[in-house]
Regions:
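N-terminal, active-site-proximal structural segment of metallo-dependent hydrolase catalytic domains
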Residues: 1-62, 68, 75-78, 193, ...
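Active-site beta-strand/loop signature of hydrolases that rely on acidic residues for catalysis
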Residues: 15-19, 30, 34-52, 113, ...
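Glycosyltransferase catalytic domains, chiefly GT-A lineage
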Residues: 29-32, 41, 96-99, 112, ...
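Structured beta-strand-rich core segments of catalytic domains in phosphoester-bond hydrolases
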Residues: 47-125
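Soluble or luminal CAZymes and related metallo-dependent hydrolases
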Residues: 22-26, 97, 131-142, 182-186, ...
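Metal-dependent phosphoester-hydrolase catalytic domains
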Residues: 88-93, 166-273
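Surface-exposed cleft-lining segments at the edges of enzyme active sites
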Residues: 119-140, 174-179
Length: 273
């Protein structure tokens, strides 16, 4: 990764991802995270705001002058905040229903960065009984076909995938086998997506199983940390060439305890330029 980025930054590039669950309501913790963790790029999911109302000013005050957004009123929405110039490449509607769940950009060095918010899929893991579950599976299948076309292109795919694939990605594999996000059919679908471009799971590259690794804890828990019933729903996947430049990855569990928290936490990978 060289060229423009190397000329204008340090010798590393830090990219973070966070389902923020309303960017306007949680702008205080967004700016706190940006100030403390100092990512060069932050991808947000579930921004819940139309493009014209997106809060640019506090982000630009911190140096994030390049903002690409694909928003929707009160629901869904994705955004990419960057100190590095970005060119929007695409925004796909993998449900054909107008929901704002994806935006892709290209960095000056040619790296493609794809930010996605996969549907949660409702509560019942049955396509016939729960149309939302079928929509989720179809969304992932369409992503899989799209992913096949990315072979040979340096790409980082990040976001809330709403699937925790491994046993050590959930607090209880046995109890969650029939719970949407960890069912075998979802895990198999995500596996096909990963195989479509030989994606490298950066979280598990640096924190290999069976080590515990979570990015989400329900609001329903009175004490989320004590109960620790977490799941790893958020992911950063890289094409092999990009993964080879990754030097570190971390999740920020302390953010779950901040004032007005999201139920998700940020994750960040650092790359050598």
């Amino acid at each position: 990764m060289r060229g423009y980025i190397a000329a204008h930054m340090t010798d590393t590039l830090k990219i973070a991802s966070w389902n923020i669950n309303s960017v306007r309501f949680r702008m205080d913790i967004v700016t706190r995270f940006l100030a403390e963790a100092a990512p060069d790029i932050l991808c947000l999911q579930e921004t819940k705001v139309v493009d014209e109302d997106f809060p640019h000013a506090p982000l630009r005050a911190l140096g994030y002058d390049h903002i690409v957004i694909h928003g929707q009123r009160m629901h869904h929405g994705v955004a990419i905040l960057s100190k590095v110039p970005l060119v929007e490449e695409d925004r796909f509607d993998w449900q054909a229903n107008g929901e704002a769940r994806h935006v892709g950009v290209r960095l000056p060095n040619g790296l493609r960065l794809e930010n996605v918010y996969v549907p949660a899929g409702g509560d019942v893991p049955d396509r016939a009984a729960n149309p939302k579950f079928g929509q989720k599976l179809d969304f992932v299948e369409r992503m899989t076909r799209w992913s096949e076309g990315l072979r040979g292109i340096p790409t980082l795919l990040v976001g809330d995938f709403n699937i925790a694939p491994l046993e050590s990605d959930v607090w209880s594999h046995k109890q969650l086998l029939d719970v949407v996000s960890h069912t075998p059919i979802e895990v198999e679908a995500l596996g096909r997506l990963q195989a479509a471009n030989d994606w490298v799971d950066l979280g598990r590259r640096f924190v290999p199983p069976p080590q515990r690794l979570y990015t989400w804890w329900s609001y329903r828990a009175k004490d989320w940390a004590a109960s620790d019933r977490g799941r790893r729903l958020d992911h950063m996947w890289a094409s092999a060439d990009v993964a080879a430049t990754a030097t570190g990855h971390r999740v920020f569990e302390d953010c779950r305890s901040w004032l007005k928290p999201s139920d998700h936490i940020p994750l960040m990978t650092e790359f050598a330029l």
